[in-house]
Amino acid sequence: MQYKKPLVVSALAATSLAAYAPKDPWSTLTPSATYKGGITDYSSSFGIAIEAVATSASSVASSKAKRAASQIGDGQVQAATTTAAVSKKSTAAAVSQITDGQVQAAKSTAAAASQISDGQVQAAKSTAAAVSQITDGQVQAAKSTAAAVSQITDGQVQAAKSTAAAVSQITDGQVQAAKSTAAAVSQITDGQVQAAKSTAAAASQISDGQVQAAKSTAAAASQISDGQVQAAKSTAAAASQISDGQVQAAKSTAAAASQISDGQVQATTSTKAAASQITDGQIQASKTTSGASQVSDGQVQATAEVKDANDPVDVVSCNNNSTLSMSLSKGILTDRKGRIGSIVANRQFQFDGPPPQAGAIYAAGWSITPEGNLALGDQDTFYQCLSGDFYNLYDKHIGSQCHEVYLQAIDLIDC
């Protein structure tokens, strides 16, 4: 009987301890300030793209410069120099992560990107010729020829107006454009040599429904009576139109970043995309505005861009096994392996643990701003600093090779 009371007390103590769930110790490693209007919980996984602060400040109506961040295996977060245009749910280069949790990115080139049949985006040499696409998905340039000059009886050298190239269809169902010709040079009675206005080459369509532009040629030069040679006006490339009659602008794409096993975030060498391709095979021009629509009377009208007021993220990118995929819950960032996003002792942003790396400065206090950028406390700017072939990401300026950037949140989709 003398043991009954101590046993009851022990049972009550055990019950109360079981009901108490202590916070993870790293959740207290948070900045004192918070970002006004920032959200600390996001319903789906997302990635980040690097946006240069200097570029963003001068591009309200134009495309923003995007740099894909990557994550390598040790959890380090690093940034790429890939750029992509912004529109409603436009696509951007996703950040990649290597196995150690580092987020990294490689430099990109200015050459236009092509896509082969296995979906790889590769850099091609930039040429003046318009691109076509064959059955394996490669984008190739077509050749163009110049029309011969004609002369009538009074000595004038004239040419008829240039017309759009007719569309042909080969046996596998591909609809392709014939080579376009340049407007011939004409000469009137006072000896002036003049050129007709150039027209846009007709678009071609291959078997997957993709509408592509044929190469437009330069208008021939004209010469007025004082001997000056002048250039004729050229016309803009024709827009593409899908089966429902809508004339649309394309979303821009960029190479997705990867994550290696140590958690570092890296991006493979990528190129600036010349055009993007949506699921119906349509190649569209990169724009920041939404595509135009065509109503039944033939008028082309601009469509209004609709944005969910509760969702600050307006960019999407393809998701794959190496893409940095993060979750945000109660101000704590985790990657797909459950590692904690933190600012470590050297001020670098990377993923470790749990728990975070010993000596970590911040491991909580993350949010997404109303502008769609990742923030830590009340700070929404970070720094990409060159480290060999990649950029590491830091919350402070640590050297001459560092540049201020935003980390824009991007929704990840299966492509």
Curated annotation (Swiss-Prot):
Q: Tell me which family the UniProt entry assigns to this protein.
A: Belongs to the PIR protein family.
The feature of type site (Covalent attachment to cell wall glycan) is located at Q76, Q102, Q120, Q138, Q156, Q174, Q192, Q210, Q228, Q246, Q264, Q282, Q299
Q: One GO biological process from the UniProt record? A: fungal-type cell wall organization
Q: Where in the cell is it found?
A: Secreted, Cell wall
Print the domain comment field.
The PIR1/2/3 repeats are required for the covalent linkage to the cell wall. Their number varies among different strains of S.cerevisiae.
Q: Which GO terms describe its cellular component?
A: extracellular region; fungal-type cell wall
User: Which organism was this protein described from?
Assistant: Saccharomyces cerevisiae (strain YJM789) (Baker's yeast)
Residue spans of the PIR1/2/3 repeats: 66-84, 92-109, 110-127, 128-145, 146-163, 164-181, 182-199, 200-217, 218-235, 236-253, 254-271, 272-288, 289-307
* Paired cysteines (S-S): none
Identify the coding gene: PIR3
Origin: domain of life: Eukaryota
Q: Is Signal found in the keyword set? A: yes
What GO annotations for molecular function exist for this entry? structural constituent of cell wall
Signal sequence interval, chain numbering = 1-18
- Tell me, what does this protein do in biology? Component of the outer cell wall layer. Required for stability of the cell wall and for optimal growth. Required for resistance against several antifungal and cell wall-perturbing agents.
Put simply, this protein is called Cell wall mannoprotein PIR3
Which residues carry the site feature described as Cleavage? R67, A68
Q: Which residues form the propeptide?
A: 19-67
